[in-house]
């Protein structure tokens, strides 16, 4: 399953909008979480309000994409945030940029807490 998630992330990162990562060398930070379908709408609202809105206000952030899919009673969430540089991510996340920064209520919603996020260098972004 992890390989399928990685493949999905690479595809989604490649499809990121141009205004999020205009300059070569921008960094995409990907987080993945899974929530029971019955709580997905509530979690999405919480994630947008308490996570995404706050990410967008952090200096160095270029934007955020949210992807979801429901399958077999579970909704997967992928959040890809775009940053000018790894230094901007370090200013937000601290020295260990691979460590997930969970929201306070994530344990209430998420099936499991993933310990790490992933980072990708944005090479191209050309969605119309």
Over which residues does each language-model region extend?
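Enrichment for repetitive, rod-forming helical segments
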Residues: 9-10, 36, 125
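An amphipathic, aromatic/His-enriched active-site/gating alpha helix that lines ligand/cofactor pockets
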Residues: 21-22, 49-62, 82-119
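Short, solvent-exposed loop/turn elements at domain surfaces
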Residues: 39-42, 55-56, 90, 126-128
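Positively charged n-region of N-terminal signal peptides that target proteins for export
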Residues: 1-4
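Bacterial N-terminal signal peptides
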Residues: 6-14
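Short, well-ordered beta-strand segments in beta-rich or mixed alpha/beta enzyme
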Residues: 26-34, 63-95
């Amino acid at each position: 399953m992890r390989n399928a998630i990685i493949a999905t992330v690479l595809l989604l990162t490649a499809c990121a909008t141009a205004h999020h990562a205009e300059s070569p060398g921008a960094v995409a930070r990907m987080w993945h979480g899974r929530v029971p379908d019955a709580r997905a709408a509530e979690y999405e609202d919480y994630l947008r309000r308490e996570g995404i809105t706050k990410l967008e206000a952090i200096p160095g952030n270029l934007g955020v994409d949210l992807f979801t899919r429901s399958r077999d009673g579970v909704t997967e969430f992928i959040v890809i945030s775009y940053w000018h540089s790894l230094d901007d991510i370090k200013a937000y996340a601290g020295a260990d940029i691979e460590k997930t920064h969970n929201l306070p209520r994530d344990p209430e919603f998420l099936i499991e807490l993933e310990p790490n996020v992933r980072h990708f260098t944005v090479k191209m972004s050309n969605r119309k």
